[in-house]
């Protein structure tokens, strides 16, 4: 009798232990999947931001307008901050990557200090222009090396969790493609010889990367490839490489890339709805045949093909025969700054060369926009009378607390300087004043 009782107790214990062990394994596996997805996201964003950084530095070199150069430097500074943040989220603690981080800090420090000074009174010196050219060449080299690592990683399905293991084993490091690639990047930066130990490290902020407002049904891998072929205008599916984020990802994605002769492309596509979130095509530009205005019409058509309707052109620029267009969502006449997208169009043939819809899909939603409690004239009364107002719009912006507020947006000129002024449409308070050389005014002296 006691024998059968003992057997029963032991059986229950064994089963209980097995269940506990399985649950422990499942939890650890979920954690690993989540970590792998975060590493993948950070790496692909780092590669993407390095592409943009190189492009924006090239844009700055091509500019001839001091008024537009300062905001361009602010954009470059922000990109270095974002790239720096992504580096910090990769498992590179055991891999010397300090010089690359310092390189990003140097660019950020240089562009920030340049952006906040008056370039009319103190324009770029020949030495500073040469430094900017050096940054352009060097960032281009890093961009190409990261793209090569990315291509191999996607082709071979490499995992970042393996990088962590390799970094703790000197022998394994020699056989890890990702580790070797980052060591190549670090050696390249070391050869630049420009790191300045006195420069401060750029502070970074953690951002919410969840895409809460994606719509549509989930697309299969084959459907994603077909969609990518249409977007990239590629007829041979075998040219495309695709990888899928793990099940633990906050936002399941397909990462799709291709290399064709001297042309390279990369895209992040949301599994839900098949929406392209980031897209970049790099190729040699030919003779310009499309005007900047014609390019904006093509950009709007591209947005419509992706289901992004009611978008209003906010600003545009041109460099190296590429048109860069920023659009805001127009909600029944109200410009929504958080629902912004950027499109790049080749002005040689009108091809789509770049797309960023992150902000749109992170923020876009059906809003119940209240009626303004003050009139536009009352809002104008809260703007300095010496400001010559040129344009006005209703706009939704984020205030200092990160909350969306309805405002009257005024574009005006004072002392030959252009300002964008946002007045709260409920209480008439000033929410934000921007000087359009990129410097934000944080005080009320213009009121």
Curated annotation (Swiss-Prot):
The keyword Signal does not apply. It comes from the Bacteria. Transmembrane segments: none annotated. Keywords: Germination, Sporulation. It holds the Pfam family PepSY. One of its GO terms (biological process) is sporulation resulting in formation of a cellular spore. Required for spore cortex hydrolysis during germination. Appears to be required for either expression, localization, activation or function of SleB. Belongs to the YpeB family. This is Sporulation protein YpeB.
